Design a protein with these regions (language model features):
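Metallo-beta-lactamase
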Residues: 1-5, 16, 25-175
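General beta-strand structural signal in soluble alpha/beta enzymes
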Residues: 22-23, 162
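Short, solvent-exposed mixed-charge patches
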Residues: 178-179
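Short active-site oxyanion
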Residues: 14-20, 157-158
Length: 179
């Protein structure tokens, strides 16, 4: 997810050799923010300090992409031989299936979600944040999008781990829809 509150520290991770995984529509944007010559909050940051010639070295940035077009699903798998992490493109499903009223400002058009199938943990950015109160939140288009993606991909989450807030159960998520 390319919003500012999710990409902080990318240059630090890149300087340490981390591969960045994103939706393929984000790749050029990430290259721009990683190598833009403008001032940085941390100056010098780790990339400038330890790899100052990275960009002109002609080494390709270690950015791998997940694609996903309308009515198709991109998937990227990372494993250490024991655990499996599946990364999926989040489709703006209701919009892509023809309901123009459900367009949510491109919020999930280039978004990914991660799933640990062995643990039943689903990580999403900004689509759903479990509440810590007993009051159920109102259903949002983002929640509908997440729920439709879970169904289409046949995922079986037990726990939702949001990018903001505390984890919550999938049962709590389903109760929002009256399921």
């Amino acid at each position: 997810h390319h919003h500012f509150d999710h990409v902080g520290g990318l240059r630090t991770y890149l300087s340490q050799g981390t591969t960045i995984v994103t939706h393929d529509s984000n790749k050029e944007y990430y290259l721009d923010i990683l190598f833009h010559p403008g001032p940085r909050t941390l100056n010098p940051d780790r990339l400038a300090k330890y790899n100052p010639m990275y960009w002109i070295s002609r080494r390709p940035a270690p950015i791998e992409t997940v694609s996903g077009e309308a009515r198709g699903t991109g998937k990227y798998v990372i494993t250490d031989g024991v655990k499996i992490l599946e990364i999926y493109h989040v489709q703006d499903m209701n919009y892509e299936l023809g309901d123009q009223s459900l367009r949510y400002g491109h919020h999930s058009e280039d978004m990914l979600m991660a799933y640990l199938p062995q643990d039943g943990i689903l990580f999403n950015a900004d689509l759903y944040t479990p509440t810590q109160s007993s009051a159920l939140p109102k259903v949002t288009i983002s929640m509908v999008t997440l729920n439709e993606n879970i169904k289409k991909l046949k995922l079986s989450p037990v726990t939702h781990a949001p990018s903001h807030g505390q984890p919550g159960s999938h049962a709590q998520f389903l109760s929002i829809f009256g399921d």
